[in-house]
Amino acid sequence: MAVYKISGNKELFGTVEISAAKNAVLPVIFCSILTSECLVIENVPLISDVICALEIISELGGSYDWAGDTLKIYGGTMHASRITEPAERMRASILCLGPMLARFGSVQLALPGGCRIGARPVDLHIKGLSAMGAEIKIEQGILKASADGLKGGEICLDFPSVGATENLIMASCLADGETVIVNAAQEPEVCDLARLLIKMGADIRGAGEDTLYIKGTAGLHGTRHTPIPDRIEAGTFMTCAAACGGEVRLKRLCPAHLKAVSSKLMECGAIITELEDELIIRREGELKAADVRSLPYPGFPTDLQSQFAALACSAKGTSVIVDTVFEGRNNHVPELLRMGADIMQQEQATIVRGGGLLGGAAVNAPDLRAGAALIIAGLSAKEGAIVEDCGHIDRGYYRLCEKLKAIGAEIERLEEGEQGSAKQGRGGVGGRRPPGRA
């Protein structure tokens, strides 16, 4: 498993180009199930979750060509199937459930995996699709679903789940009649999915609002689509720039998608200039503490609360970070403790008493966003860090090390077999590692 070797306490200057959003690309890939024609997706990042999604497409009988950053998916040879190992590796694999039921009427799917960040049940997906006429049961870790034609109706979600909203939108496009989704997610990625489906011939109204109306059609056709920029990648670089100081320009993003993040970072002392599809962030003075409560969009993203905790470690004062979306998203806390952070967990709240530079340590990336938080912590620490188990980080960040180096970060990715020097250097950065930890 690869590790990141980081030297810290250095300001960042330069330009970063933001990739297409992982959380937009994945549902777009599964949209290819809904048509027998070719779907062309542009600006696709080569990250492990995308590769996993394409393995699922292959298991379903589909094929694809990937040239540069353009992906062509051919769904004409797809068929009902049983998907096991790839589904177990990625949470978003559940998004093939609705399209498969809509087009083929059956699918068997291993219960999805992904980051371990608390309870992430699939009950909203099952409840919504069952209301459309699907029969779904779980046997020995396999989700078995069938439907003799899905039927529209009104579905009220108990929580505005992004994944459940996306699954129901895709299923509704080929259902009989009109489907109304109440308390739908309003995230930009949901709007991007609706934009693609409309180009494919779907009849969708209300994207970006809390109630969606979808009229089923006889079939969808292929098209070409460029997913929206990754607001979480952008927010990660914004937080990193604020934590380290300096001035960073972010290109190919949508500033409107980052209002909650920009507002909170400015409260901490960052200076942000918004342009049409760019953003400049700089921080010259002292960081100030701020409280954060993660909420569904347009609130502060749950996918950025771990990174904000890393920033809060060096901000003067006490920050309280509450995640209202995932109750167990605190895997970064024990790792930041290894670096000397004054941080504690109280139920859903993470309390950070900041004000000084973190020390160095060898830490483990327990999930995607916690891994990003540890990189930010290492870059802003006085002694840097070694971040192990980088496979989680690879799931969601494209060329992260290369992009960080371009703005002056001293970071090196070491593959297995190249890690001798990093491990020998742990007297400096790994002194806080407890005995017996592998």
Residue ranges and their predicted role:
Residues 1-438:
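Short, structured segments at the rim of ligand-binding sites
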